[in-house]
Amino acid sequence: MKNSHISSPTTLAEDFVAGKMPRQAGVGRRERRGAETRLKLFRCALQLIAKRGFTNVTVEEITEAADVGKGTFFNYFETKDHVLGVMAEIQLGKVREAISLAGQGQQAIHSVLHRLVLCLAEEPGRSPDLARALISSFLASEGVRNIIERNMQQGHKMIAEVVAAGQKRGEIDPRLQKEKVATQLLQAEMGTILLWSTHGEPALEAWIEDSFQHFWRAIAVSGKE
């Protein structure tokens, strides 16, 4: 079942998570309420997935937790798999913000990438249980994998452009291929989250911080580590 809500702009979800409910022209009360409901369903789904695992959570349980009718769920998501697409949207929004900051030229690329890796860890870093559940859902569901892969491809391209900006400014070794550096950043991020999810201590932020410092030393121009 399809509805106009399903293709609603990802920026609404991104802005809600960032605490920036849009009030610009063209975004009316109905759109804001729709974004609120969509995000509420997503948050309730995450709580249930963290407790039981993706495959053990039903649409009925998600709508009951969100206090909406089952039909409402399908106004916003084609399938249960698409709920985790909101996670991908949120993460992609953070990458868009990074490329915007890089384009403005007011911050060092080191700062832009450092901020990005910390922001990308915010959602899975809510709890080790959630991180493990998200990882297992990616492995278990082809539908989820397809959604995540599409967004990761976009994110990878944008991160590569941030890297290219760093090379032009003399911060990142120009001999490195920007695409490979982007891949390494994503590998470091995802690998760190996986390892943290099996330990839980210290906080994920500390793990990401350490991982990023090693990553940056490997790509930085000598003397700018």
Regions inferred by a protein language model and the residue ranges of each:
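Basic, helix-initiating cap at the start of DNA-binding domains
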Residues: 1-52, 56-65, 82
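An amphipathic alpha-helix adjacent to DNA-recognition modules
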Residues: 35-43, 55-56, 67, 76-100, ...
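Amphipathic alpha-helical segments enriched in hydrophobic/aromatic and basic residues
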Residues: 49, 58-59, 69-70, 80, ...
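Amphipathic alpha-helical packing segments from all-alpha helical-bundle domains
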Residues: 93-96, 126, 143-169, 179-187, ...
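Amphipathic alpha-helical segments used for helix-helix packing
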Residues: 123-143, 194, 198
